[in-house]
Amino acid sequence: YYEAPPDGRHLLLQPAPAAPAVAPAAPASWPHQQRRQALDEFAAAAAAAADAQFQDEEEDGGRRV
């Protein structure tokens, strides 16, 4: 990345700091982790329901009104 000093002089490009190979997992007690898990479960349930409805329509020949 590039850092310019506040007085307007330009520095040479500096190598970016090394990022950890694996991000540490957030504790499950964090609220955003709980919301994410709930959203994941809801998305899985919605996908399963949509797939089941699609299968029903396929068995009926696709004519569902």
Curated annotation (Swiss-Prot):
Region: Disordered, residue numbers: 17-36
GO molecular function terms noted in the UniProt entry: hormone activity
Domain of life, source organism: Eukaryota
Keyword Transferase included in the entry's annotation: no
Coiled coil: none
Biased composition (Low complexity): 17-28
Record keywords: Hormone, Neuropeptide
GO biological process, alphabetically ordered: neuropeptide signaling pathway
Residues in the signal sequence: none
Chain's role: Neurohormone that anticipates ovarian maturation. Acts as a true gonadotropin and stimulates vitellogenin biosynthesis.
Assembly description: Monomer.
Protein name: Ovary maturating parsin
